[in-house]
From Swiss-Prot:
The gene is HA. This is Hemagglutinin. It comes from Influenza A virus (strain A/Qu/7/1970 H3N2). Keywords: Clathrin- and caveolin-independent endocytosis of virus by host, Clathrin-mediated endocytosis of virus by host, Disulfide bond, Fusion of virus membrane with host endosomal membrane, Fusion of virus membrane with host membrane, Glycoprotein, Hemagglutinin, Host cell membrane, Host membrane, Host-virus interaction, Lipoprotein, Membrane, Palmitate, Transmembrane, Viral attachment to host cell, Viral envelope protein, Viral penetration into host cytoplasm, Virion, Virus endocytosis by host, Virus entry into host cell. InterPro entries: Capsid_hemagglutn, Hemagglutn_HA1_a/b_dom_sf, Hemagglutn_influenz_A, Hemagglutn_influenz_A/B. Its main location: virion.
Length: 328
């Protein structure tokens, strides 16, 4: 359309829409391949390859699992009373103390991880007429035999092992986590040489719960020179409740309690390096930006993260349909 000017000249006004030589293909409800002039990617599909240590407090487990740090494996002593937002377990982590099992390992691991602390308070349990602080060459602490620092292995004193009955009230206003265990000797001879009785028993109770464990005597596969095992259990004592421990043998006693906290702490298995940087969202692959609404890096996340989707790409059309001019 020609428009007259004040000086009798004319100007040309072109009516149409913007087009670009190379548009972006997007999916719509009715068509898988629509070309538009511009589109924004909504899916974060890559990580930085490293875990940022800010703003979250990251605790690198190095060669210790969270449970080994909890029990006090000698090579994990550096984790005593530590705190974290996210505990990172490494594939190279290993146990280096008396061989043990935890019947409900995942639940204990999750419970401690969410608490975000290994804060430990020693208590004055009274164990009479038994020998305390048992150790083993399977658990070296320095040059000599040792044991888990948070547990107390009780054995006979002389030729006696009396029935033990100990109570410990919770007079504080927070939950207390007690870790204890039961020793399973490999032979009947080992059983009587340590505990006198041919069959031991351990009962741990509160007003809300009771657990009774009978040791299973028998040889297991050799681990660090031992064919015996220890089973690890735990009890939570609420404020105003009381812990009661009754045993006539095979007791691996607590030395105190872990102070339980409520929060959003967690645990993650990852071999990504930890670096000085800032990122709100962490995955096992590394930290990722959270400036997109979706991500397909990993289902497992910690922090303020985009929602996980299976799609590699989702685009939001921010321009019109692209119809480039055809030259003939």
């Amino acid at each position: 359309q020609d428009l007259p000017g004040n000086d009798n000249s004319t100007a040309t006004l072109c009516l149409g829409h913007h087009a670009v030589p190379n548009g972006t293909l997007v999916k719509t409800i009715t068509n898988d391949q629509i070309e538009v002039t511009n589109a924004t990617e909504l899916v974060q599909s890559s990580s930085t390859g490293k875990i940022c240590n800010n703003p979250h407090r990251i605790l690198d487990g190095i060669d210790c699992t969270l449970i080994d740090a909890l029990l006090g494996d000698p090579h994990c002593d550096g984790f005593q009373n530590e705190t974290w937002d996210l505990f990172v377990e490494r594939s190279k982590a290993f146990s280096n103390c008396y061989p043990y099992d935890v019947p409900d390992y995942a639940s204990l691991r999750s419970l401690v991880a969410s608490s975000g602390t290994l804060e430990f308070i020693t208590e004055g349990f009274t164990w009479t007429e038994v020998t305390q602080n048992g150790g083993s060459n399977a658990c070296k602490r320095g040059p000599g035999s040792g044991f888990f620092s948070r547990l107390n292995w009780l054995t006979k004193s002389g030729s006696t092992y009396p029935v033990l009955n100990v109570t410990m009230p919770n007079n504080d206003n927070f939950d207390k986590l007690y870790i204890w265990g039961v020793h399973h000797p490999s032979t009947n001879q080992e059983q009587t040489s340590l505990y006198v009785q041919a069959s031991g028993r351990v009962t741990v109770s509160t007003r809300r719960s009771q657990q009774t464990i009978i040791p299973n005597i028998g040889s297991r596969p050799w681990v660090r020179g031992q064919s015996s095992r220890i089973s690890i259990y735990w009890t939570i004592v609420k404020p105003g409740d009381v812990l009661v421990i009754n045993s006539n043998g095979n007791l691996i006693a607590p030395r105190g309690y872990f102070k339980m906290r409520t929060g959003k702490s967690s645990i993650m298995r990852s071999d990504a390096p930890i670096d000085t940087c800032i990122s709100e969202c962490i995955t096992p692959n590394g930290s990722i930006p959270n400036d997109k609404p979706f991500q397909n890096v990993n289902k497992i996340t910690y922090g303020a993260c985009p929602k996980y989707v299976k799609q590699n790409t989702l685009k939001l059309a921010t321009g019109m349909r692209n119809v480039p001019e055809k030259q003939t």
